[in-house]
């Protein structure tokens, strides 16, 4: 069923899109340089070698839209009834850069730029801090700056950083800063590291089609099984794309995790205070980005609870009015739909 999309809450709720991307020209130019000089990993060559160089309509349109935080983006939000967009620097951010000083500078300048755009469109935009996990101590300070000086409402990290995952103890300063500020961490996909990408790349499955979700789901699962939520019980981690498959897998994840712990198969795998399902229901938040499919949305609400699922568009990578209508037309109670589209985001991002 088609209906006109308007902002302002005419259907009983505002629409807050929670995983929306932007880029800076410096960032795109940096990726191009890395692709050309051979310092990019295979995933960056595949993803940004295409988007930043292809003359195809999809690639050129996405770059144009990523670089625009002005009138075009506001117009697109108006056309699809999006009242507010929660913005973060597009993946992989500053994380692939081999020069740590350059990574810090790129991230800080992107944060300053985003803060200016949020200030200019305060009723439409919300910002998330980008960091350079290559330097965990600096990233911790930048999280605090983002929260307390720039007015940002969360932190986005684009999965692995040059093949390293956040369960490594070296990244603990980042989690200390998240605890100090009370901000959520959004783990956004990135292309898999070279150690994982081979079979995906040779089949064209390394990007958003499959590799993104598999790699990000792995990252979240590593964090859960490492005991991150036992060490930081108030921490909230967000993931997109209906939970990167973990809600569907969770019964078997719990069964096999508990079997491994009991058997002592992996000496480093320790008992947890809760089951994986319980952590999904207490510490993980899920957005619908790129997954405008009623069965998946309803299933995920059933698994993790209606308070833990939030709407997202995934602009500009997916920008379709009918995907907004799919959410509007879900056969759920009005109060549940308002949580999905508006009030869960207001709660968890402290809007």
Language-model segments: which ranges?
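Divalent metal-dependent hydrolysis catalytic cores, especially in the metallo-beta-lactamase
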Residues: 15, 57-61, 65, 74-97, ...
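Non-membrane alpha-helical structural segments and their capping/turn regions in soluble enzymes
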Residues: 67, 104-111, 136-140, 165-168, ...
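Acidic-and-aromatic substrate-binding clefts and catalytic sites of carbohydrate-active enzymes
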Residues: 62-68, 95, 133-139, 162-169, ...
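Mid-to-C-terminal alpha-helical segments outside catalytic/metal-binding sites
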Residues: 1-16, 23-84, 112-120, 141-145, ...
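Catalytic pocket-lining loop regions of alpha/beta-barrel enzymes
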Residues: 5, 118, 144-304, 308
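Aromatic-lined substrate-binding rim segments of carbohydrate-active enzymes
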Residues: 74, 78, 101-108, 167-182
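Surface-exposed, active-site-proximal loop segments in enzymatic domains
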Residues: 90-106, 137, 202-205
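Short glycine-enriched loops at secondary-structure junctions
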Residues: 133, 189-195, 315-317
């Amino acid at each position: 069923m088609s209906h006109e999309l308007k902002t302002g809450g005419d259907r009983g709720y505002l629409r807050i899109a929670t995983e929306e991307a932007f880029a800076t020209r410096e960032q795109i130019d940096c990726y191009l340089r890395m692709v050309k000089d051979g310092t990019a990993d295979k995933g960056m060559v595949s993803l940004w070698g295409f988007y930043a160089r292809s003359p195809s309509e999809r690639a050129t349109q996405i770059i144009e839209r990523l670089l625009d935080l002005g009138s075009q983006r506001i117009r697109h939000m108006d056309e699809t009834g999006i009242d507010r967009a929660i913005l973060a620097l597009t993946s992989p951010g500053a994380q692939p850069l081999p020069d740590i000083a350059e990574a810090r500078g790129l991230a800080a300048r992107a944060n300053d730029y985003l803060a200016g755009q949020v200030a200019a469109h305060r009723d439409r935009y919300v910002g998330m801090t980008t960091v350079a996990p290559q330097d965990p101590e600096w990233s911790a300070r930048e999280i605090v700056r983002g929260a307390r000086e720039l007015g940002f409402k969360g932190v986005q990290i684009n999965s692995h950083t040059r093949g390293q995952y956040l369960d490594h103890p070296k990244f603990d300063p980042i989690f200390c800063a998240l605890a100090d500020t009370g901000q959520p961490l959004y783990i956004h996909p990135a292309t898999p590291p070279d150690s994982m990408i081979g079979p995906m790349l040779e089949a064209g499955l390394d990007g958003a089609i499959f590799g993104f979700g598999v790699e990000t789901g792995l990252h979240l699962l590593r964090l859960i099984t490492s005991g991150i939520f036992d060490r930081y019980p108030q921490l909230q981690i967000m993931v997109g794309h209906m939970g990167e498959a973990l809600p569907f897998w969770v019964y078997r994840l719990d069964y096999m995790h508990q079997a491994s712990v009991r058997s002592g198969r992996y000496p480093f795998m320790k008992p947890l205070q809760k089951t994986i399902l319980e952590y999904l229901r207490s510490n993980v938040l899920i957005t619908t980005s790129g997954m405008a499919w009623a069965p998946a949305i309803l299933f995920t609400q059933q698994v993790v609870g209606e308070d833990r699922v939030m709407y997202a568009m995934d602009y500009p990578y997916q920008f379709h009015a009918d995907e907004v209508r799919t959410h509007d037309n879900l056969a759920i109670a009005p109060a549940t739909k308002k949580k999905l589209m508006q009030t869960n985001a207001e709660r968890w991002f402290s809007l």
